């Protein structure tokens, strides 16, 4: 089995592989498909196919601002971004295309982390018949009351989350992106980033996580509506991986999103797996998360 980044499973896959589950893994904000590598490796070693999606202009297509490379913050505040104008329709199209290809070879389990949850909901609406299971890993799951990632973030249940607003470079409205400087050398900014992303990680692992982060995320992705419809998204079996020390999507907000989703589809509620010590990026050891994801292959 092979790992892929941003590419669907081959439609020419041999018949003996047909029926095996493909996991389609969707990264979160300011990230890339490579975020999933430790978990994907575990799943592949257990006999599954895995696709680690790169959303448009992320990962292998990443935009690296010239000013970011040389750490010129004045220039970085105004350098145009090709991510401006991208939105959830683009993200949905990317993931849906991969799901369509993967589904030719067998069942698909779609998993989203963080902002990747809004793509899971949109794709669940678009192609529910192609999805064996959907999973939100400390991810946004919008509802009628909280229809966007922005609305979820602003909910009172997210009050104890760490906001990156003071790390923002430039004007998001003018740039069309939320731009963050992950190469900062300012100790206070690094401490804020660590608390937001992975407070429980050793510093060396924190720096490794930062090295994979991308400066720009389009503001339209946060503002796009992603409420699953009852007759489409609402009929796909679903799981939530709840992280108890998340300072980006607070645990109380995760609980509210789970409760509102379950209230909308009482006959198809979340199966919740609790990781009480996990920060936003999840446990440093990928095995416990992979253990849960592995079980989804057999669940309808």
Spans of features found by a protein language model:
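N-terminal export signals
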Residues: 1-13
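The conserved beta1-alpha1 loop
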Residues: 24-30, 54, 113, 242
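Conserved alpha/beta-hydrolase
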Residues: 40-78
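Conserved hydrolase catalytic core segment
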Residues: 106-150
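Flexible "cap/lid" loop of the alpha/beta hydrolase fold
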Residues: 135-179
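Conserved strand-to-loop "acid loop" that flanks and positions the catalytic carboxylate
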Residues: 239-246
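Conserved alpha/beta-hydrolase "acid-adjacent" motif
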Residues: 247-257
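Catalytic active-site module of serine/aspartate enzymes centered on a nucleophile-bearing elbow/loop
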Residues: 264-300
């Amino acid at each position: 089995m092979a790992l892929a980044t941003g590419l669907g499973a081959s439609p020419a896959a041999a018949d003996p592989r047909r029926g095996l589950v493909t996991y389609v893994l969707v990264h979160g904000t300011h990230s890339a498909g490579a975020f999933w590598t430790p978990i994907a490796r575990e799943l592949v070693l257990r006999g599954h196919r895995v696709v680690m999606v790169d959303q448009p202009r992320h990962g292998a297509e990443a935009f690296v601002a010239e000013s970011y490379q040389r750490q010129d913050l004045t220039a970085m505040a105004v350098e145009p971004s090709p991510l401006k104008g991208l939105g959830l329709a683009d993200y949905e199209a990317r993931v849906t295309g991969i799901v369509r290809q993967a589904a030719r070879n067998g069942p698909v389990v779609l998993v989203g982390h963080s902002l990747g949850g809004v793509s899971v909901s949109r794709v669940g609406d678009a192609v529910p018949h192609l999805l064996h299971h959907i999973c939100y890993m400390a991810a946004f799951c919008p509802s009628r009351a909280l229809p966007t990632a922005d609305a979820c973030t602003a909910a009172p249940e997210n009050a104890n989350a760490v906001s990156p607003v003071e790390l923002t470079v430039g004007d998001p409205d003018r740039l069309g992106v939320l731009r963050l400087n992950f190469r900062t050398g300012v100790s206070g900014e690094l401490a804020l980033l660590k608390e937001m992303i992975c407070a429980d990680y050793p510093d060396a692992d924190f720096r490794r996580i930062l090295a994979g982060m991308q400066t720009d995320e389009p503001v339209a992705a946060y503002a796009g509506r992603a409420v699953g419809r009852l007759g489409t998204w609402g009929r796909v079996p679903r799981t939530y991986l709840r992280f108890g020390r998340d300072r980006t999507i607070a645990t109380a907000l995760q609980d509210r999103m789970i409760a509102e989703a379950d209230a909308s589809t009482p006959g198809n509620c979340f199966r919740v797996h609790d990781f009480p010590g996990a920060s936003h990026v999840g446990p440093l050891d990928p095995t416990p998360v992979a253990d849960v994801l592995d079980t989804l292959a057999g669940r309808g």
